[in-house]
């Protein structure tokens, strides 16, 4: 569970990546969005910003009292963002460096969620006011491993302890392999406004090599369900540097992704950890 001032870099989305807005002909927008000066400026190996302080800087000096003091010092009038990390998956994708664990049982997920909701309550109590929340992001792991009931209960809990605005963006990282239409409908009813879909690559050989078998029609079907239930803001994650990829095969994946007309495509470079 993480909290950030609204407008600050979001811990779940501020990895080094190219964010591409999609519209028009599948490849036509790309060249006009590329700037050589930005490519040169950001073409470097840097740590992933996922939290503050970053992991190497944690020490006994940063304890619960320190955290509570920081929370109490926030501007009561400032809008905030919340990030909830669901640290479990049905199985591991071999390219992934995220903090997660595979489980075939729901009991560990349920226990983890209870602890997460208690932390959300304690953080709310430490804030100087019942502060406005303009953005909620569920990341992981696989947030859609939660049952529809637990997902709805989580959002209800946040609304109870925080002032979640009526126009708040509620975003979820969604695994198309495990979410059926009933689940998508339940998310929409709970207030989800944006879905981020992990694809990485549409090539079957690449998918097998990274242990993420996800045919194109599975992704397309979930996107159709999302739009049918009113979730029109859709992100797609692609990754370059994976086994068996070529420039030609990656361009084929980009074309297929663009044809599905997502709001954004995030293109990540594979990072071996």
Where are these regions (language model features)?
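Divalent metal-dependent hydrolysis catalytic cores, especially in the metallo-beta-lactamase
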Residues: 81, 94, 170
